[in-house]
Amino acid sequence: MTSSSVLVINSGSSSIKYQLVDPETGDAIAKGLVERIGDPMGFIKHVYGDAVTEEELPVPDHTVGMREVLRLFDTEGPSLAEAGILAVGHRVVQGGRYFDGPALITDEVRNLIEELCPLAPLHNPAHLKGIDVARELMPDVPHVAVFDTAFFQQLPARSALYALETETAEKYSVRRYGAHGTSHQFVSQEIAKLEGRDDLKQIVLHLGNGASVSAVKNGKPIDTSMGLTPLEGLMMGTRTGDIDPAVVFHLQRVAGMSVDEVDTLFNKKSGMKGMTGESDMRSVWDMIHNDDDPEAQQRARTAMDVYINRLLKYVGSYTAELGGLDVITFTAGIGENDAAVRRELAEALAPFGVKIDVEANQVRSGEPRVVSTPDSAVTIYVFPTNEELAIARQALTFA
């Protein structure tokens, strides 16, 4: 049992995910989740060592959910008193222009997070529920907000600003905020350590159901694909990614769709799911290789071509912005586990001297690894992200 730890909380609209982290080793001492908050019957899972506890019980609100989390630590272990919690780190999606790093949660900081809810209406209100309850139930430890957008507050104006009327943009805080910043910062810093140099020109591909790209030069971000919201950029599991904004007006005029209907279409019914009916990449690959319906097979292959092509566009443009490229890193669920996506992108980059080691690329491992050949012009890494550890380390600065 460690004598010092950080409790990391990610509070969603109907869930609480948590992890007790040893910030020195990076080990998850215990972890779990509370799901279906507000439904007639909720679900709780707590993992400590080899012991897995699962329960179904009513969880009417986040207060009850957080109390159940603390109960499970008491009954199933580890005791939070023995774990020596030094801080509680809260994931917060949107920090706006206010936060370029982690922040000790005071009443003032809490109110600023609330003020930013219009920029992240699905996320910040849910984070606040978890923050308010956790501060009430654990008042004797520092609570720290770690923002997904903080890393990208360093973006140069040429990348952060849209070509929108300045007065309107400033009045309504319209600019590129990015997302997945905690992951992009963590991965790019760890790659710099592995390479033994800080003057790297890096592209980080955070590829999960939500996906984003960042260009990092000398440890600083110079561009990223997500924008005002996480909708912009790459094709994703259910999101369009980049799309002509006039499509919104077109659908309103010819289909009679409301703003909310277009929002739902773009965010929840598009991307891979919209083009193939499946949001999971494993299912899409299965359609490509095994589907008996030639039309479905072709739709899936076309969707994958669009996905790879969007990646290729961003890698190409970011390489130009960086003035060259030393490292490409794949991370998150698809980036870490989908060898075919990595191979197809690398093959598309072959004219620029990028060479993937086919055997190394096929190896499944939870460890950081190089999957390019020794003579590749760019080193390709697969690096497991660890946002919980990153949040824990940032929270620890206030302990």
Predicted regions: what they are:
Residues 90, 121-125, 142-147, 153, ...:
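General beta-strand structural signal in soluble alpha/beta enzymes
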Residues 187-190, 194, 305-323:
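Phosphate/ATP-binding catalytic cores across multiple sugar-kinase/actin-like superfamilies
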Residues 339, 343-387:
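Conserved phosphate-binding/catalytic loops in two-lobed NTP-binding clefts
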